[in-house]
């Protein structure tokens, strides 16, 4: 296969992603003699397209999968998509809204058909994007969380949990999104501080009696003045919920009110009598020290109500309007319209004492931004703290208890380890899980009701009828309309994708999976729940390790979101996109269209020329370079450019190797070298003669292989990327290729063969090492390099994917060669620095004289001569007993002295040095003046101060050298 002159990723990627899949390389094996590696894809929501976070997450997962596949493991990466109940229903409802249609106009059955249509369209977009990213999951195992096999498992799990007493139905206070018309979990509620008001309202004593209320105190805190009152003052941020008040609570230690505990108040606007109660929940220092208690509309009040056996009066409908339990004057009003009217009515009756601005935490739905209402509704719950019955895997222990134990024992390991604290904290404070949602899209709850409301939980309607008949009921049954929380089915993925409840070969081979790669934002949503469900139903943990990575943010650290207009589509980084198309993409379909102008302005400023096409490999290398443990990632597009240059460097290096090796004897015989046949530095004559440089690059390769193996073991893809970059760019391309040129041009035939063999073998190994991170370019290059490097290609086609992953061979470490090369590098750098100091043109070749301390060193310096001549652009290199007297600068490397033999115009050089010394003096004075300014040091960013200090250090070092040269002149 001929290698193109330049690296053009598009055609290469299109060919290989089709070819790999066609050849069946992604399909998992279940060979009993092999170790297994399995990994679950966090199923992306079927609602749309992949974002940069997916690109990051999938780069890591694919890297691990390719690495273990090359190491000979049975490798199963299981892909799938999530039905994403709320999110998907919102998307489809918005589409209908554009046609002036509601889901209720269509009816449940027709609406669900529409959602399935959307799923088919969107799901294929997502899998197409995954393929573009070069991912290699076993597509034959692809699932959808609402496909038939998964739905059967969901039903089976639900029924079993009900039979075990671990799922129950009850009327409880839940987070209610009045726009969606469904319960949502705590994790789907975002609370942020907002500007609001505090209203102080007078609640009159029902019997009309009065009491003395202190209004002034001395320094010791004793009351000095009182006023006569026949009311108490309640402070609230939600006056509309007072219509559902059932008590007013005070601090048991608050002497202002203790004598009133037990008395009745008249609830304003409602003419109901409610008691004054004492409860530790109240803080006497906050507000007026009196708190209205509305158990049906506040979680804290609900707890107080439970302690005091209070009624629960719900005054809101499910769409947040005032209901029939409130006075007729407010019924049917929106909650905020009612608030306004209630405040006006209180004021008119002289019961509104004070209104003041107040900052408060407002809970909003993360999907709709609607203010969440605590609402008393009938819901289904999983009992998180109830002991499991006999016959389960962990009888006598709750599912939460088992989930905590599995992390504590190390059966499930979280990386970084600090995430275990977050996991434990959440589980130790867990509430029963509300799993029902008042939606149409999702797994419909497998429960049927008879005409009297009695419920029969069953795997299907026929089974429900059998259960009803057993209890003497033969009438019609109505199925529960609610669906399950999306996270319920997602929590079952570790075993629902492996054939459970059957013990299939997949189940035995791939559970627990080896690692879960996930962002910290779904530790609670998904990770903990998978541990609970998998241990409860299989007795096994779902995964051995959880690799928790940071979240991708924009370059300034802002969270990426559609509303901020700062999202990036990974495909746009691969293919490139014009600024016009990028603006259009970011401004279409905004929740708030008014944001379009500011988003367009910011986008044009940041990407005036759009985004260049970087290709998949450059994007993947960028992602890998960011993948340290745990921290958030400020994504900088310039890194993609740097890693595209890296891919170009690797491509061009391969072209150089091919040009020097194709059609040549590259040192490969059918049989391995006979004893003494493979020489080192000519010490044994024969077919190949390996130089110190050859052995150095092979030795460095072993160290790189060790570092990369550790990177994979520790999930430190940033270290893997760094090791690859440093070895390929710095060592192989910048140093070894340059040395190899010299050896091919000036060496004996045996040395040339050894050089070509080393060039090819190291390059072929590099390609296998880098393949898990940059699969496309490595495959394309390997196809041309491998046959030359002695690899026998399979007649039906071969692939780097199926080759063994390189492993370090300690026997090939060579510290002597490494020492030799380190000295050559120092010598080369010294020569280059001398050229710089003397301001010699890069085109000018000058002689080098080296002074050796003894005969042995003279021979060593002589071995460097041909390399130095090429690397430092010298006309000749001479080794002498002593350097000649000359005003030219001298560099010392170890015991050797180096001088460039150049005629110097002493007068002109003194004048040049004088000017340069004066300039540097001025720069140092200016910089020191800045650093001596306290305001500058205090106010400037630490990075700027450090840069200024570094400038002073560099200028000072250069100045010292120039002064030494000046003295010599």
Curated annotation (Swiss-Prot):
Enzyme class name: ligase
GO molecular function: aminoacyl-tRNA deacylase activity; ATP binding; valine-tRNA ligase activity
Catalytic activity from the UniProt record: tRNA(Val) + L-valine + ATP = L-valyl-tRNA(Val) + AMP + diphosphate
Sequence motif 'HIGH' region, residues: 44-54
InterPro entries reported in the protein's UniProt record: aa-tRNA-synth_I_CS (IPR001412), aa-tRNA-synth_Ia (IPR002300), Anticodon_Ia_Val (IPR033705), M/V/L/I-tRNA-synth_anticd-bd (IPR013155), Rossmann-like_a/b/a_fold (IPR014729), tRNA-bd_arm (IPR010978), tRNAsynth_Ia_anticodon-bd (IPR009080), Val-tRNA_synth_C_sf (IPR037118)
Listed GO biological process terms: valyl-tRNA aminoacylation
The enzyme's E.C. designation: 6.1.1.9
Residue interval(s) of motif 'KMSKS' region: 559-563
Pfam family membership, one: Anticodon_1
Cellular compartments per GO CC: cytosol
Residues that bind ATP: 562
CDD domains to which the protein is assigned, alphabetical: Anticodon_Ia_Val, ValRS_core
Keywords, in A-Z order: Aminoacyl-tRNA synthetase, ATP-binding, Coiled coil, Cytoplasm, Ligase, Nucleotide-binding, Protein biosynthesis
Entry's localization field: Cytoplasm
Coiled-coil region list: 812-839, 904-969
NCBIfam families linked to this entry: PRK05729.1 (NF004349), valS (TIGR00422)
Family indicated by similarity: Belongs to the class-I aminoacyl-tRNA synthetase family. ValS type 1 subfamily.
This protein's domain notes: ValRS has two distinct active sites: one for aminoacylation and one for editing. The misactivated threonine is translocated from the active site to the editing site. The C-terminal coiled-coil domain is crucial for aminoacylation activity.
Assembly, per entry: Monomer.
Free-text function comment from the UniProt entry: Catalyzes the attachment of valine to tRNA(Val). As ValRS can inadvertently accommodate and process structurally similar amino acids such as threonine, to avoid such errors, it has a 'posttransfer' editing activity that hydrolyzes mischarged Thr-tRNA(Val) in a tRNA-dependent manner.
Record protein name field: Valine--tRNA ligase
Lineage: Bacteria, Pseudomonadati, Pseudomonadota, Betaproteobacteria, Burkholderiales
């Amino acid at each position: 296969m001929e290698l193109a002159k330049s690296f053009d990723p598009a055609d290469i990627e299109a060919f290989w992603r089709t070819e790999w899949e066609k050849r069946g390389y992604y399909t998992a094996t279940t060979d009993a003699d092999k170790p297994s590696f399995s990994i679950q894809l966090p199923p992306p929501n079927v609602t749309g397209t992949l974002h940069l976070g997916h690109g990051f997450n999938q780069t890591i997962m694919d890297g691990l999968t390719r690495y273990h596949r090359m190491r000979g493991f049975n490798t199963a990466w299981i892909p799938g998509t999530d039905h994403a109940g709320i999110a998907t229903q919102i998307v489809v409802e918005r589409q209908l809204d554009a046609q002036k249609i509601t889901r209720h106009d269509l009816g449940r059955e027709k609406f669900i058909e529409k959602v399935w249509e959307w799923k088919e369209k969107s799901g294929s977009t997502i899998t197409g994007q995954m393929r573009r990213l070069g991912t290699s999951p076993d597509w034959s195992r692809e699932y959808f969380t609402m496909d038939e096999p998964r739905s059967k498992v969901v039903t089976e799990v639900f029924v079993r949990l009900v039979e075990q007493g671990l799922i129950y139905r009850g009327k409880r206070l839940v987070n209610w999104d009045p726009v969606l018309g469904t319960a949502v979990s705590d994790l789907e509620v975002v609370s942020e501080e907002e500007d609001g008001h505090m209203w102080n309202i007078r609640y009159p004593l029902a019997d009309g009696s009065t009491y003395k209320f202190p209004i002034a105190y001395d320094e010791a805190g004793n009351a000095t003045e009182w006023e006569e009152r026949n009311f108490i003052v309640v402070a609230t941020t939600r006056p509309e919920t007072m219509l559902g008040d059932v008590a007013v609570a005070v601090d048991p230690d608050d002497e202002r009110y203790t004598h009133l505990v037990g008395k009745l108040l008249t609830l304003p606007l409602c003419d109901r009598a409610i008691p004054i109660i004492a409860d530790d929940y109240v803080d006497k220092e906050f507000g007026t020290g009196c708190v209205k208690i509305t158990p049906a509309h506040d979680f804290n009040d609900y707890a107080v109500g439970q302690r005091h056996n209070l009624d629960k009066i719900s005054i809101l409908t499910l769409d947040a309007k005032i209901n029939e339990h409130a006075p007729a004057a407010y019924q049917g009003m929106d909650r905020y319209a009612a608030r306004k009217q209630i405040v006006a009515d209180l004021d008119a009756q002289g019961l509104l004492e004070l209104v003041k601005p107040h900052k408060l935490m407002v809970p909003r739905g993360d999907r709709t931004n609607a203010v969440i209402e605590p609402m008393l509704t009938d819901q289904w719950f999983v009992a998180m703290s109830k002991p499991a019955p006999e016959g389960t895997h962990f009888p006598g222990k709750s599912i939460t208890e088992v989930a905590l134990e599995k992390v504590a024992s190390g059966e499930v390991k979280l990386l970084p380890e600090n995430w275990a604290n977050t996991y434990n904290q959440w589980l130790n404070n867990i509430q029963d899980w509300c799993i029902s949602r008042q939606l149409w899209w999702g797994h419909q709850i497998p429960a049927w009701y008879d005409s009297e409301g009695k419920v029969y939980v069953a795997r299907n309607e026929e089974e429900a009828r059998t259960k009803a008949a057993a209890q003497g009921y033969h009438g019609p049954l109505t199925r529960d309309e609610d669906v399950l929380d999306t996270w319920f089915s997602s929590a079952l993925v570790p075993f629902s994708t492996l054939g459970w409840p059957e013990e299939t070969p997949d189940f035995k081979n791939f559970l627990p999976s080896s690692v879960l790669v996930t962002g910290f934002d779904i530790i609670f949503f998904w990770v903990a729940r998978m541990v609970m469900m998998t241990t409860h139903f299989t007795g096994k943990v779902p995964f051995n390790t959880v690799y928790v990575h940071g979240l991708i943010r924009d370059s300034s650290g802002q969270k990426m979101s559609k509303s901020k207009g700062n999202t990036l589509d990974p495909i746009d980084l691969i293919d490139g996109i014009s600024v016009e198309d990028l603006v259009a993409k970011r401004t279409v379909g905004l929740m708030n269209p008014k944001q379009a102008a500011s988003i367009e302005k910011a986008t044009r400023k940041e990407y005036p020329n759009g985004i260049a096409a970087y290709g998949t490999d450059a994007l993947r290398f960028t992602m890998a370079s960011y993948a340290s443990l745990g921290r958030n990632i400020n994504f900088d597009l310039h890194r993609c450019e740097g890693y595209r240059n890296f891919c170009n460097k690797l491509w061009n290096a391969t072209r150089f190797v091919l040009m020097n090796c194709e059609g040549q004897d590259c040192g490969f015989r059918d049989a391995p070298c006979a004893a003494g046949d493979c020489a080192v530095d000519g010490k044994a004559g024969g077919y190949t003669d390996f130089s110190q440089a050859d052995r150095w690059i092979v030795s460095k390769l072993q160290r790189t292989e060790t570092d990369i193996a550790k990177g994979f073991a520790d999930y430190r893809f940033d270290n893997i990327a760094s090791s690859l970059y440093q070895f390929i760019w710095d060592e192989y391309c910048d140093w070894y290729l340059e040395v190899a040129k010299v050896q091919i041009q000036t060496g004996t035939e045996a040395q040339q063969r050894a050089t070509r063999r080393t060039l090819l073998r190291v390059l072929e190994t590099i390609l296998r090492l880098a393949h898990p991170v940059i699969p496309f370019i490595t495959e394309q290059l390997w196809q041309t390099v491998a046959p030359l490097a002695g690899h026998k290609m399979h007649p039906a086609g071969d692939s780097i994917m199926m080759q063994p992953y390189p492993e370090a061979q300690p026997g090939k470490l060579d510290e002597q060669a490494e020492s030799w090369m380190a000295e050559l590098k120092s010598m080369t750098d010294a020569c280059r620095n001398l050229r710089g100091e003397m301001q010699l043109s890069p085109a000018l070749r000058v002689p080098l004289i080296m002074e050796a301390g003894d005969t042995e060193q003279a021979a060593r310096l002589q071995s460097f001569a041909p390399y130095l001549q090429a690397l430092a652009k010298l006309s000749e290199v001479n080794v002498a007993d002593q350097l000649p007297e000359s005003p030219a600068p001298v560099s010392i490397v170890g015991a050797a002295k180096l001088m460039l033999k150049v005629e110097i115009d002493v007068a002109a050089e003194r004048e040049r040095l004088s000017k340069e010394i004066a300039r540097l003096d001025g720069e140092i004075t200016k910089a020191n003046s800045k650093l001596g300014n306290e305001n500058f040091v205090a106010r400037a960013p630490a990075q700027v101060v450090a840069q200024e200090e570094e400038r002073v250090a560099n200028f000072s070092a250069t100045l010292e050298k120039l002064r030494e040269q000046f003295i010599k002149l």
